[in-house]
């Protein structure tokens, strides 16, 4: 199975922490971009040999693109690719969705939405540049459900300005009471070139130890309320994991369309140049080397709670992994950073906090 990612590089306003490629467009630019995306979908038809089972509209703010344009993209994908029981996700900003939007995309086949809540505390949302309050998030959830979209994911951000354990619990309470199916919980990362990067010395942020405590607390509370952690930053009710993102973490194939969108097809990684006008006129594809190596497979497998399996590695590469990996893992297991069961290595929540370091030690 293959996934298709559609990048919508449009936002009503830029959040101060965001490093993704996006800008505020006019209606003419939206229409021009739609034409370019439809053309690109058709031109890349020959690249995909397997059926498509996920389509993901990310951004930017796909909901700012408009329901009719999203429907046109989905219709084009259906006309040019074989879709089998697809999970079709659209990222939404609560401030840019209305009843009509959900009605249009639901009829087009969208069955999952992901909303950038970040925090349910309005003072924290304001510091993050969010245009809507907590009540608008709740209203957007209700509108989605009214139009038959019940698979809803919300983002939660840890370590944001002014956040405390008390305010974090307020956000978690909101997530749990909303009865949603999926939660992505990310730690705030200050990216170079963003307003937060310039402001970082004046931001009131929780210290690193507190953020780590917040992460472990979030894992515990979500687990107690029916959410299974299936990846470092992702939690789902049973059967509601993001099928599209699992393509990435399981080194499965996917096609990315749009400026800055990445692809992995036929063992090769490539991406489109991070330039809107270039994509409209003559999309420049930049090769990014081979993908799916043994090392990459191990690294991505260890992001998942299911972990790195000796037998699955053999199925993939025709041989067992180096025994040294399991020898090193036994030492780390003593410190509750990972566990070894049935010849499978998986990280604990404490291990996820320092996953880059652990993976580096296992592979060195």
Language-model segments: what does each one mean?
Residues 1, 22-43, 53-319:
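C-terminal scaffold of the Radical SAM
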Residues 1-5, 48-51, 81, 354:
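N-terminal [4Fe-4S]-dependent radical SAM core
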Residues 6-8, 117:
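Alpha/beta-hydrolase
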Residues 350-364:
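Short, amphipathic alpha-helical interaction segments positioned at domain boundaries
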């Amino acid at each position: 199975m293959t996934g298709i990612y559609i990048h919508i590089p449009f936002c009503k306003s830029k959040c101060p922490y965001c490093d993704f490629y996006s800008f505020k467009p006019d209606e003419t630019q939206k229409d021009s971009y739609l034409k370019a995306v439809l053309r690109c979908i058709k031109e890349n038809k020959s690249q995909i040999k397997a059926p498509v089972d996920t389509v993901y509209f990310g951004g930017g703010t796909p909901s700012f693109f408009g329901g009719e344009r999203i429907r046109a993209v989905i219709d084009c994908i259906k006309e040019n690719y074989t879709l089998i029981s697809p999970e079709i996700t659209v990222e939404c900003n609560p401030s840019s969705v209305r009843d009509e939007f959900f009605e249009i995309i639901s009829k087009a086949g969208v069955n999952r939405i992901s909303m950038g809540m970040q925090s349910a505390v309005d003072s924290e949302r304001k510091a993050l540049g969010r245009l809507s309050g907590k009540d608008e998030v709740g209203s957007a959830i209700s509108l989605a459900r009214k139009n038959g979209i019940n698979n809803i994911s919300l983002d939660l951000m840890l370590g944001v300005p002014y956040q405390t354990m008390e305010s974090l619990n307020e956000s978690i309470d909101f997530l749990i009471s909303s009865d949603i199916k999926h939660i992505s919980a990310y730690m705030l990362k200050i990216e170079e070139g963003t307003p937060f990067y310039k402001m970082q010395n004046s931001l009131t942020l929780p210290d690193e130890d507190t953020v780590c405590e917040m992460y472990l607390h979030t894992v515990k509370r979500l687990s107690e309320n029916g959410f299974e952690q299936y990846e470092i930053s992702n939690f789902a009710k049973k059967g509601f994991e993001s099928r599209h993102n699992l393509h990435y973490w399981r080194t499965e194939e996917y096609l990315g369309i749009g400026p800055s969108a990445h692809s992995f097809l036929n063992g090769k990684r490539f991406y489109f140049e991070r330039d809107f006008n270039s994509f409209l006129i003559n999309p420049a594809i930049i090769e990014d080397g081979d993908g799916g190596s043994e090392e990459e497979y191990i690294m991505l497998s260890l992001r998942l709670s299911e972990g790195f399996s000796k037998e699955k590695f053999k199925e993939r590469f025709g041989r067992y992994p180096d025994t040294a990996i399991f020898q090193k893992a036994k030492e780390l297991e003593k410190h509750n950073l990972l566990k070894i069961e049935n010849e499978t290595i998986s990280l604990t929540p404490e291990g996820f906090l320092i996953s880059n370091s652990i993976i580096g030690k296992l592979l060195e």
